[in-house]
């Protein structure tokens, strides 16, 4: 049993910038934040490292990909798509929908955090991903296919997809 309390700064993979069509982020990837949100998370990571270096605060940093699962905030991509499709409402996709996300089930994220808490080394950074890279467009179309099987009367659900102007700083 560990005798000390470790401070885990749960960060985001957005600190690394946009995920390309090939490859993935790892602990050696340079920071390249593209939005105020990701810049603030990168700054937080650097602050945690400084506290570790200066005051020997026992810390680790975990950078995780996009979580999904039960009780997720309803404005996030997967739940908002499901809820809107259930109500027969249009589902917006930002830009061309080609933004790639790595999707991680929330229970898998929790299990990874427990592993880091039990076996992680002080001052290290751990990337936690689901190896489920998919474009936003693809995930919404996949949700539509599932909804077509469940709510047959409202098929095809893909007719409810529309594209809107991309948000500033959206990676």
Please identify what each model-predicted range represents:
Residues 7-13, 62-64:
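SDR active-site strand-loop-helix element
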Residues 1-2, 12, 21, 77, ...:
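Activation loop
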Residues 8, 17-21, 56, 72, ...:
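Proline-centered turn/helix-capping motifs that create local helix->coil transitions or kinks
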